[in-house]
Amino acid sequence: TDSELYAQISRDLGADVPFLRSAENSSDSASSWAVVREVIERYGNEGKVFDTCVLLQPTSPLRTSEDIRNSFALYCEKNAKSVTSVCEVEHPVQWCFELGEDRLMDSFVNSPYKKCRRQLLPKNYQLNGAIYITSCENMLSEDFDFYGEKCYAYVMPHDRSLDIDDDVDLAIAELLMKKRAQ
C-alpha cells in the first residue's frame, strides 16, 4: 500500500508492513511486476537478498498450499526460469470470435469449427492469476520477461482458478470457500 492509514490498519491486525509503496508504483496503471521489483530492490538495499520470488495475488484466493508447493516443486524440478498457474479454458478458443459494430456473426458462421464437438477440439489453457514464480535475478534483469524461454505451466483445476474481478466473482468465491469449509 501507499497509504499510511492502511499500513497502520494492517499492522494493528498483525501484518508486517516494512515500507510503503512508492508514488510511481501506486497508480492504477502500475503493474504487479513493477511493484514486486520495487520490493526486491528495497530489500536488497537493506542487505536482504532472496533467490526466488513467488507472487500470490490476493484476487485468486482459492489456490491451496498444495498448489503452491507443487508449483514450486515444478520450478525446481525443471530448473525453470519461471512457472505460472493456468487452467483449462472453459469454452474452446475455436468458438471465440470478434463482433463488428454490426453484430453480424459471419466469422463464426463461416468457421470450420462451428459444428465440432468440444470434446474433439484440442485443450486450451489460460492464465488464472493464482501463482507466479521466478528468480529474483530474473525479476531484476534489464530484459525481464516472465513468459520467455523456460516458463512452465502449473495446471490447476477450474474450481481453484477463480480470479476475482467483479462482484459476481466475489460471490462465487465466497460460495466456494463456504463449501470448502464444510
Tell what function each PLM region has:
Residues 1-3:
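Short beta-strand/loop segment that forms part of the nucleotide-sugar
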Residues 5-54, 62-66, 70:
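Short phosphate-binding loop-to-helix
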Residues 9, 18, 108, 141-142, ...:
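Residues that scaffold the ATP/ADP-binding catalytic core of kinase and kinase-like folds
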Residues 24-28, 91-92, 159-162:
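A short acidic, often aromatic-flanked loop/helix-cap motif at beta-alpha or helix-coil junctions
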Residues 29-34, 38, 61-150, 154:
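Conserved core of the sugar-phosphate nucleotidyltransferase
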Residues 44-49, 78-79, 101-103, 182:
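Short, glycine- and charge-enriched coil/turn segments that flank and shape catalytic ligand pockets
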Residues 153-155, 159-182:
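Hydrophobic helical membrane-anchoring modules
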